[in-house]
């Protein structure tokens, strides 16, 4: 089984530590995790590679939206994941979810970390994009 983790950054605590705890255990069962990162570095990169995972760097969606979309779509089409787990700060960040749905294939898990989003537009998007 191949799982793609989206939305983790270079902070070795919080969600990154949580996901790595799962990865350490699931890797023993032959489950593969790959990671998409739009920052210059991802936390635990060396350990990810030691456990058989891969890290794919894509452009930052805020700085290069079209570059992000192109790179993310190419990755999804090439790798064919069973599960795509999207970690996001609010439900307003729907770009990776929409792209995963467009490509199809695996199940998509949306994991939002905040109960609310600041700013009027973000609040509207947050509300509209909740299940």
Describe the role of every protein-language-model region.
Residues 1-131:
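Membrane-interface segments of envelope glycosyltransferases acting on lipid-linked substrates or membrane lipids
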């Amino acid at each position: 089984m191949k799982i793609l983790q989206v939305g983790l950054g270079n902070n070795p605590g919080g969600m990154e530590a949580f996901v790595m705890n799962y990865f350490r255990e699931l890797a023993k069962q032959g489950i593969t995790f790959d990671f998409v990162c739009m920052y210059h570095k991802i936390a635990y990169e060396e350990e990810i590679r030691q456990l058989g995972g891969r890290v794919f760097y894509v452009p930052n969606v805020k700085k290069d939206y079209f570059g992000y979309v192109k790179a993310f779509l190419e990755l999804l089409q090439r790798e064919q994941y069973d599960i795509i787990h999207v970690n996001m700060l609010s439900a307003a960040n729907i770009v990776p979810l929409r792209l995963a749905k467009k490509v199809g294939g695996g199940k998509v898990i949306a994991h939002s970390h905040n109960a609310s989003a600041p700013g009027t537009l973000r609040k509207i998007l947050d509300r509209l994009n909740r299940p």
